[in-house]
Amino acid sequence: MDHPDPSRRRLTPGLELAALAARCPFPASGTAVTCAVSGGADSLALLALAITAGCVATAVHVDHGLRPGSDDEADVVAAAARQLGAGFRSVAVTVPVGPNLEARARQARYAVLPPDVLTGHTADDRAETVLLNMMRGTGLDGLAPLAPGPRRPLVGLRRSDTERVCDLLGFEPVQDPSNLDPVHRRNRVRNELLPLAADVAGRDVVPLLNRQADLLAEVADWLHEVAGAVDPTSARELAAIPVAVARVAIRDWLVQGGVGGGYVVDAAAVERVLDVARGSSVATEVVGGWRVARSRGRLGLQPPSGQR
């Protein structure tokens, strides 16, 4: 299961933090970065390791106002930032009413964060997301989510690592009670499905899921590169290439054209567009009121009526 490396306990706290930071692809020392910090162990560790890596970090806490005590969570982040010598600011947002609270809160949060914000996603988060996307019937990109890199520097670490960082620094992370609520599908994946998979496999499956995501990311990158040379509006060209490449070319065209607006361009939508390209139908609705129509062998993208 997920256990810290016993050998690291022989290191001093400073060396242990440095060793963990060295495993993370943070930007170069001296780079100014913004870290999204909720007050949980992962985001507090993100801030601490960014400072350890030499970044000039500012912690941004987003208060969604969804539960009592959110002001206290901001205080936890502010205190950690002071201890580390990082900047701090808190932003309050209003989460719109509607279904899928988790998605709406995420959308409200990212609307006020800079596009290059660093997040504290770990290998455990990535494994959960692979399984969640698989259950939604995702395509290849969804099976390779949360790619590691400077914006997600902790993807190579485990939750036990982020908890260890907090222990070393004396942080008491915020415990979000909603993380135990089985009404949220991610919680069931985290607390039920992954432990069951580990029991059946007789080993920790998080590294296996991450390894598969890495391999599929390489395939996805290649497909996107090949699809980039295709004219997705040409029905003849789409018919002449492997269907896997055609699917990627169509989806990239739709997304780059602005289709989505909070909706997912799923595999079924791509297949409907392929049917239009093949001549099985003249036009189809994609998602959110967007349509694709065929005329004289070419596909055209039509925005919702209110955007024309």
Task: Label each residue range with its predicted role.
Residues D2-D42, T58-H64, V93-V95, A108, ...:
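AMP-forming adenylation/ATP pyrophosphatase catalytic core
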Residues D2-E192:
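Core alpha/beta nucleotide-donor-binding catalytic domains of modification enzymes
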Residues L113-D116, A197, V219, L301:
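Enrichment for repetitive, rod-forming helical segments
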Residues T122-A269, A277:
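Flexible helical/loop "lid" subdomain adjacent to adenine-nucleotide binding pockets
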